[in-house]
Amino acid sequence: DVYKRQVVNWAPVIREGMHVDPLTIMSKAVLEGTGHDCEIARVVARKNDIKLNTPTGGVIGERSLNVELGESTTVENTKEIYPGLFVSGMAANGVSGSFRMGPIFGGMLMSGKKAAELICAKLDK
């Protein structure tokens, strides 16, 4: 079966301490939006020994708080970091080694909009 437009929320599994075997999901595009920890990008890079579209080829990690730069770089760092893997929001800054916090004045919304546009453009090809 093919299911379209799905979101997987793992939070209840973690919260309840449930043991769940790994889920296998096939997708043309994945949006990494796990926030500061950028968990999806970290796991994908580590387990597959791949290079990400970052200056170091890996997850760089966040820098200290800078409201002004954090706001703008959140949108700038929203991109495809590996074929089919897109990053947005604070995960975008974490992956790219930019500043934490700050994007509270629209940067998060603009990052999400940019991610959606990038994904739609890729899927339309």
Per-range role (PLM):
Residues V95-L123:
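A conserved FAD-binding loop/helix module that cradles the flavin
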Residues V20, H36-E62:
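Glycine-rich beta-alpha-beta "Rossmann" dinucleotide-binding loop(s) and their flanking helix/strand
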Residues V2-Y3:
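Short, small-residue-biased leader/transition segments that mark boundaries at the very start
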Residues W10-P12, G35-H36:
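Short glycine-/small-residue-rich Rossmann-like dinucleotide-binding loops
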Residues G17-M18, P22-I25, T74-I81:
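Solvent-exposed alpha-helices and their adjacent loops that cap or buttress functional pockets
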Residues K79-F99:
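Short FAD-binding loop at a beta-strand-to-alpha-helix junction that anchors the flavin cofactor
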Residues T24-G35:
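Short hydrophobic core segments
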Residues T56-K79:
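Glycine-rich phosphate/nucleotide-binding loop
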